[in-house]
Amino acid sequence: MSTTTRTLQAIKFDRDNIKLEILDQLLLPYSTSYIPINNIEDAFKAIKLMQVRGAPAIAIVGAFSVVVEVSNYLKQSDSNQKTIKNLNDSLNYLITSRPTAVNLANALNDIKQLLQKYNETDIIDEKIYQQIYDYAITLYDEDLANNKKIGENGLKYIIDTLTEQNFKGPFSIITICNTGSLATSGHGTALGIIRSTYQALQKNNSKQDFWLDHIYPCETRPYNQGAKLTTYELDYEQIPFTLICDNMVSSLINTLSDDNKKPIKTDQSAPVKFIIVGADRIVENGDTANKIGTFQLSTIANFFNTNRFNTTATATNKQIKFIVAAPKTTIDLNTKTGDDIVIEERPANELTTLVGPLLNESGKVGEKLTVGIATPGISVWNPAFDVTPHELIDSIVTEDPHVFTKDKNGEFNLIK
């Protein structure tokens, strides 16, 4: 199904007819098209091709695809019935579609845990199906509820931080990739905090002495999720924003700084006070894997905090707070440090080409084209993620009301 109607619903699951559809995010923002996921293989391809992306969303799609697959099992003839081993093999295969994001592995491992009470040779039956169905529904519903809690907790942290700093006036936020409704069951993580903050701290309705004036999403090369998806969501929600290239961040912060009188525009001169990012995996010590470019943002924030404006910066007076936002399902306590995170590498052509629709002079959308932008045959390194050291992270916001911050030794304690 393809339409021009805009939507932020990334996942459609028909609970009565057991049908799964996902919004093809490769076509956004110019076309809205849902594609069916009829089995685990369909889910693997959609996740691998990034038609659906975002750590929470791919976990939900993965779990729902298992429900659909098992539902299909029950419709097959007796001679072609599937066993627990067949399903476990399919789950192991699906986990490999995106190895860095822990949410997918966590969800599928939870399903495998449900199956442990059965023998590998047992036939999949209605009882097993119902357990998997109930798990997937709960995963979806809890993700949506947790995202709203993340938004609320992030808003409180922002208010507390600015109040403690005695900050007054407008401020801005930088974000990267897409961490909103399109990456989750709804509302979002980092973008969820931005949503909640803008709703509460607009200039005309803020009960504080400060207000959220502007968002700066990074385009997020090479897949451009920020340019394609985050701008789509911000525009949909009518939250003021300006798109920037990934390599403009330092210049932007300097231009918008309190001490610098060279604003881009008079209505966009609010200083950057927060950089808020999502996460695909947070390990025990707080090291965080997220979209490539996140580490770069944290080092920029650290530079401005320690070298540019606050030569004696402390935890309470830092100019720019670097916040990681994610559900607790993204926390991987089995991995000690970021050195042990497997980083997915994407195909070279994603870096050497651009894919998008042809636009005529009037802006009408035409056929999709692939355009080369680099010398053919060159060596390419294209990691999908990088790891931000916990030393460069100020706080980790989850659905837990307790926002994780570092102790006096500069360490996170995520085992709570």
From Swiss-Prot:
Keywords: Amino-acid biosynthesis, Cytoplasm, Isomerase, Methionine biosynthesis, Nucleus. Its main location: cytoplasm. Its EC number is 5.3.1.23. It is an enzyme of class 5 (isomerase). One of its GO terms (cellular component) is nucleus. Gene3D superfamilies: translation initiation factor eif-2b, domain 1, Translation initiation factor eif-2b, domain 2. GO terms for molecular function: S-methyl-5-thioribose-1-phosphate isomerase activity. It is found in: Cytoplasm; Nucleus. Pathway: Amino-acid biosynthesis; L-methionine biosynthesis via salvage pathway; L-methionine from S-methyl-5-thio-alpha-D-ribose 1-phosphate: step 1/6. The active site is at 280 (proton donor). The record marks 177 as: Transition state stabilizer. GO terms for biological process: L-methionine salvage from methylthioadenosine. It catalyses: 5-(methylsulfanyl)-alpha-D-ribose 1-phosphate = 5-(methylsulfanyl)-D-ribulose 1-phosphate. It comes from the Eukaryota. Pfam families: IF-2B. Belongs to the eIF-2B alpha/beta/delta subunits family. MtnA subfamily. Catalyzes the interconversion of methylthioribose-1-phosphate (MTR-1-P) into methylthioribulose-1-phosphate (MTRu-1-P). This is Methylthioribose-1-phosphate isomerase. The gene is MRI1.
